[in-house]
């Protein structure tokens, strides 16, 4: 593919061929809210950042007095629109199509996670797969949380092994024009 006179590369990783592989949890699956909230609280006390991907898990933490360092949300829970109660100092907006990750989002997440203030990323489209760039950019020990539909919350403790697994998934993705 040739790109001329275009400052913005409009490419995505597409994951249609990986749906089954991506449907399983890639961390600790919590089905008990008390255990989940205790684990998250202890991680924060130890100085690690909490990053949520998904409206529902973000809201569960907020309702229990835990404010994530970074929230990645699309404004929908199982495609219905929940109310936002917490307003963050820094808000970002990105576009991302369902079943894909735009190349530019990797750099955006890396820059946001380097910032001391965190914030909230509003995704025009779908945020589910943004666990991938967030996990690659988070620090060792940080926790990335996402919802596992009809099961519970999945907590990824970021380390080199999980980054290796994420890179392996990316290598299997197909690069397409967005």
Curated annotation (Swiss-Prot):
Per the record, the pathway is: Cofactor biosynthesis; coenzyme A biosynthesis
Give the EC number(s) listed in the UniProt record. 2.7.1.237
Q: Keyword Transmembrane helix on this protein?
A: no
Reaction(s) catalysed by this chain, per the record, are: 3'-dephospho-CoA + GTP = GDP + CoA + H(+)
* Family as reported in the entry's similarity comment: Belongs to the GTP-dependent DPCK family.
Q: Which PANTHER family match?
A: GTP-DEPENDENT DEPHOSPHO-COA KINASE, UPF0218 PROTEIN TK1697
Instruction: State whether keyword Lyase applies.
Output: no
Q: Where does GTP bind?
A: 55, 57, 74, 76, 127
Q: What is the superkingdom listed in this entry's lineage?
A: Archaea
Function comment: Catalyzes the GTP-dependent phosphorylation of the 3'-hydroxyl group of dephosphocoenzyme A to form coenzyme A (CoA).
A GO molecular function term, named singly, is:
kinase activity
Output this protein's name: GTP-dependent dephospho-CoA kinase
A GO BP entry: coenzyme A biosynthetic process
Keyword entries, A-Z: Coenzyme A biosynthesis, GTP-binding, Kinase, Nucleotide-binding, Transferase
Which EC class heads this enzyme's classification?
Answer: transferase
């Amino acid at each position: 593919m040739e790109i001329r006179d275009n400052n913005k590369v409009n490419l995505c990783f597409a994951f249609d061929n990986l749906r089954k592989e991506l449907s399983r949890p890639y961390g600790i699956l919590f089905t008990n809210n008390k255990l989940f909230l205790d684990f998250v609280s202890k991680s924060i006390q130890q100085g690690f950042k909490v990053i949520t991907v998904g409206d529902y898990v973000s809201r569960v933490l907020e309702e229990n007095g835990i404010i994530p360092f970074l929230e990645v949300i699309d404004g929908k829970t199982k495609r219905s629109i929940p109310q936002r109660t917490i307003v963050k100092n820094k808000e970002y907006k990105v576009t991302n199509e369902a079943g894909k990750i735009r190349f530019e989002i990797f750099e955006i997440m890396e820059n946001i996670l380097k910032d001391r203030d965190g914030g909230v990323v509003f995704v025009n489209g779908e945020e589910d797969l943004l666990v991938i760039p967030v996990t690659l950019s988070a620090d060792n020990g940080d926790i990335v949380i996402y919802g596992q539909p009809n099961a519970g919350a999945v907590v990824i403790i970021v380390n080199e092994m999980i980054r290796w697994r994420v890179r392996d998934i990316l290598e299997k993705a197909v690069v397409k024009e967005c």
